A protein has these predicted regions:
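Alpha-helical transmembrane spans
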Residues: 1-31
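Alpha-helical membrane-targeting segments
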Residues: 47-51, 71-77
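Short linear motifs in intrinsically disordered
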Residues: 32-37, 67-75
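Terminal and domain-flanking low-complexity segments
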Residues: 89-141
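Phosphoinositide-dependent membrane-docking surfaces
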Residues: 54-72
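Conserved beta-hairpin
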Residues: 21-60
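Short, surface-exposed polybasic-and-hydrophobic patches located at secondary-structure transitions
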Residues: 75-96
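Extended low-polarity, hydrophobic cluster-rich segments
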Residues: 64-68, 80-82, 102-104
Length: 141
């Protein structure tokens, strides 16, 4: 006995499989992102499409860093995201709280002018900046 599915049902099944694949890949990409630091040198590991890639850069190669997302609840960060632009044209996004705090801490220690520029671009009052300072003081590498 043969069962024939109508064309819309087949299209719907393939669409659901595609959506599930995208969701799984998004979670894999997020979990695979990693930022490591040693004396101002960074290695950012990420998955682009299917292939794992790495970007090596020094803190002095950072041209600009833009705070793209911040969500604060009960005096601490829940979410913080940065877009980082390098001198050689590369750009990438830090989406994990610990990686963003690591980058900010190295900026505060090694490149104070970049750190002050990042803080000046935050469209908020001093309470957000004081929360950032407190989080950085409590952050351990």
């Amino acid at each position: 006995m043969k069962i024939y599915l109508p064309l819309p049902a087949i299209i719907l099944i393939f669409y659901l499989i595609y959506i599930i694949f995208l969701i799984v890949m998004k979670k894999i990409r997020f979990n695979a992102e990693n930022l490591e630091e040693l004396d101002g040198e960074f290695i950012f590991t990420f998955i682009k499409k299917i292939k794992k890639e790495q970007i090596y850069f020094h803190i002095d190669e950072v041209k600009m860093c833009v705070l793209t997302r911040i969500f604060i609840r009960e005096g601490t960060f829940r979410t913080i995201n940065f877009n980082i632009f390098l001198n050689d044209g590369y750009n990438f996004r830090l989406r994990k709280k610990n990686e963003c705090l690591l980058f900010l801490q190295v900026c505060r220690e090694k490149r104070k002018e970049l750190y002050q520029k990042i803080l000046s671009m935050i469209p908020a009052d001093m309470t957000v900046i004081s929360i950032i300072e407190r989080e950085l003081d409590n952050f351990k590498r």
